[in-house]
Amino acid sequence: METANLVTISISCLLVSLTGYAIYTSFGRPSEQLKDPFEDHED
């Protein structure tokens, strides 16, 4: 396997895993701990 293919596959896997983690953090169980700054301040 060429070096360019290996680098491309590695970067693609990294981006997919980071995207999956971001979606899990936003909508999964950890999202219950996130705070909404607009709900904290009353006008």
From Swiss-Prot:
Transmembrane intervals: 5-27
Gene: psbN
PANTHER family: PROTEIN PSBN
The protein's name: Protein PsbN
GO terms under biological process: photosynthesis
Bilayer topology annotation: Single-pass membrane protein
Family note: Belongs to the PsbN family.
Any Pfam family matching the protein: PsbN
Keywords: Chloroplast, Membrane, Plastid, Thylakoid, Transmembrane, Transmembrane helix
Compartmental location: Plastid, Chloroplast thylakoid membrane
Main localization (coarse): plastid
Gene Ontology CC: chloroplast thylakoid membrane
Function: May play a role in photosystem I and II biogenesis.
